[in-house]
Amino acid sequence: MAQPAELSREENVYMAKLAEQAERYEEMVEFMEKVAKTVDSEELTVEERNLLSVAYKNVIGARRASWRIISSIEQKEESRGNEDRVTLIKDYRGKIEVELTKICDGILKLLDSHLVPSSTAPESKVFYLKMKGDYYRYLAEFKSGTERKDAAENTMVAYKAAQEIALAELPPTHPIRLGLALNFSVFYYEILNSPDRACDLAKQAFDEAISELDSLSEESYKDSTLIMQLLRDNLTLWTSDISEDAAEEMKDAPKGESGDGQ
């Protein structure tokens, strides 16, 4: 039987869209990886870049949601002292973690070998470096010990490199710059346990975007305002958490002393 001919770049993009419509995201990833690997030193188009991002986001998102649910059940069973069940849950969680690691390793390898080196426009550089930070952050969510430390350090390096370009080259209202600020602040809050830094970063990004709202382009208005809303929601949540923590520290601390700042 004759081997099917290799699909062209356009055909792979079409097949990725088809897979997206059918919600077959693993196959969508495969089609977009082929596109990324066939362009060599050429940049992906904005459409191709977004398709790749959507494919991976769905594939990783399903596993991250599974991991959170299983971890929550594990905590409940631990608190009840059900050791036998905890052992079963840990094994099952490990299976999900293997899948998460494989997905993250796949996109990180593609970013390092093709996507970051071939990017020339500031927008695409920030997009891919942010993506690199995101997938190292996803690793840091479930890894422990040295692996977690390494993942967190790699997240920081990628986000900082993206931030440097974004602040210099992209307007404060640009959805990619705002998305970077959103994810970087989440990293500070969730992975580094630095709520003050998380709030500072989110507030600065939000305030700068608000001050330049008039310059927001028609095509990015919806994306930008949505991310700004998410930044504001996080700020509301985080500042209330900080206030509660501070109140607890004041209650517990000896008179004349305050709790340590982050």
Curated annotation (Swiss-Prot):
Domain of life of the native organism: Eukaryota
Alphabetical list of Gene3D superfamilies matching this protein: 14-3-3 domain
Expression induction: In response to penetration attempts of powdery mildew fungi.
InterPro entries from the UniProt entry: 14-3-3, 14-3-3_CS, 14-3-3_dom_sf, 14-3-3_domain
A matching Pfam family: 14-3-3
Transmembrane portions of the chain: none
Membership in a protein family: Belongs to the 14-3-3 family.
Protein name: 14-3-3-like protein B
Species for this entry: Hordeum vulgare
